[in-house]
Amino acid sequence: GEYCHNIQLIPGRGHHIDYNPTTPWLKSFVRTPRPLHFVWEDFPMDGRYRNGFYNIHVHERDTTGGNERTRYEMDIRDNVVSLSLERVKYMTVEREPKWGIPMVQHTSCERATKGRFTLYLSPDMVDFDCKVSVIVNGRRVFNGYLKPDVRHLATSCACFFDPERLFPAAVEVAL
């Protein structure tokens, strides 16, 4: 669930980029569509948010104080799903001189206190024959048996459009 980011500013290239080095670099990584651990920062691109990521479909975001970014960290171990949600703010302290791209930033985080999302789960992530606990920001929001339902397969398909991310069970979470 972790990504290695590699950004190179190439003078004189603008958006005319030689993508030939990208494919061999990407090939050295393995896609994990249903990770047991991830850290994801949800933010708008050109004013639009993604509907979801990994196994989470976000319905409402915590935009307290004009905040646009939320960091989600998930760990699954022994049928316990632990999630931490934080509002994230950046303060740029150094910019690249030619294009003004932020190069060094200070980060501050606060626990998210609002929001609503669907957490999708599959049998390769948790054991459906045993109780599952979901803990969000230290608070237990679910403790019980998951009930597989074709409805969750359909809604996860509609959200992610990814055959590797079809989930038979879901937990609705409201902070």
What positions do the PLM features span?
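Alpha/beta-hydrolase-fold serine-hydrolase catalytic core, especially in secreted/extracellular enzymes
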Residues: 1-175
